[in-house]
Amino acid sequence: MKKLSVLSLLAVVILGMMTACNNKTKAQESAKAVNVIYMIGDGMALPQVYAAMLASGEDMTFQQFPYIGVVDTHSASNDITDSAAGGTALASDHKTNNAMLGVNPDSIPVKTVLEALAEQGKKTGIVVTSYVTHATPAAFYAKVPHRKQYEDIAVQMAENPYINLIIGGGMKHFAQRKDSLDLIGRMENELGWKVYDNLAEVDVTNQKYAVIADTNHMPKAADRGDFLPRAVKTALKTLDNAENGFFLMVEGSQIDFACHGNDSTWMMDEMMDFDYAVKAALDYAKEKGNTLVVVTADHETGGLTLPDPQGKYTNVVFDYSTGSHTCLPVLVYAYGPGAERFTGWMQNNELKAKIMNACGMENISDSIPKEPKKRFKAVKANLDSNSNN
């Protein structure tokens, strides 16, 4: 009888714990996100993440995310996207043609999640290790028919009323321009920016600043040290007191660069660097409780696989099938209020709506366009050709 009473008491305690946990989960899922940290590992799919785990022998921050989904990355024009079309889809509701930035296939400008949330009163920021005018960051603020219009993109960035801070490289598009425009001078004297060339000099009380810390892209991870995680922490300190919350986009830009070169050592350095940046974001979100963190990629680069060439299942190597992009899906990882929306299979142009909805806001955009009718045409043609050989 006594044993039965103890078991009954234990059952009540366990049931109470399960109910409390369930209520906590429901409360977290019903809460609205005040802040959003949107992180993009350029060129990063599951092979890159798992390769970093294997080679480092360490757990990755990615493993801490409670919600994971699969993202289809094809563009409006191709089964394999470039970073311009991929970035535009992640930033807006629109798939566009490769090389196009911030516009749909008909060259009509589209509204990005950064712009939409800024219009709702949120502060915004961008942190990258590429040019600040490179395809992925530019997809959040620029509207140009071709991604290589760097000087035009720089002007659009300078004149953008929605960006409160931006950190990265690419000073040559501002200060060494073909049109001889002193864009830095104009930014500081006419457009309200404070421009730094060193992250350590930043005054986080400034309401609008740019850190353009290199003439070109930032150096490789092995040479730039902890620039990216420090930049994320600096941005978070700046945005922390935003009255209506904030939106921060962070890109691990050079994972893609390394995979284009099939350089595994460089790729590993960039993956670990990006993981440290993700940790900084996740730590902030766990402390605040009102911050949604979404981590994904624009595409996979390199066709990375992890085989054993000997077929003995003992010696894993990094093996690349291309020096370019692939059509492999990528993953999306989510934590915080609204994170449960980021599960299952989705298109890359669905993430903006999920973020807006997580913030308790109606998605301010056109309806999501239908899938291109000729999807996988090139793949099917290749399969048909191979079957005839």
Model regions and ranges:
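Bacterial N-terminal signal peptides that target proteins for export
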Residues: 1-9
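C-terminal motif of bacterial Sec signal peptides marking the signal peptidase cleavage site
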Residues: 17-20
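N-terminal catalytic scaffold of extracellular/periplasmic and nuclease hydrolases
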Residues: 22-177, 183-201, 300-389
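Structural motif
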Residues: 38, 211-213, 247-251, 294
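Metal-dependent active-site segment of extracytoplasmic phospho-/sulfohydrolases and closely related
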Residues: 46, 272-311
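Active-site His/acidic residue clusters
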Residues: 135-141, 215-220, 232-236, 240-245, ...
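A Trp-anchored, charged/polar loop motif used as the substrate-binding/catalytic surface
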Residues: 193-196, 225-240
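Gly/Ser/Thr-rich active-site loops/lids in small-molecule metabolic enzymes
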Residues: 266-282, 313-326
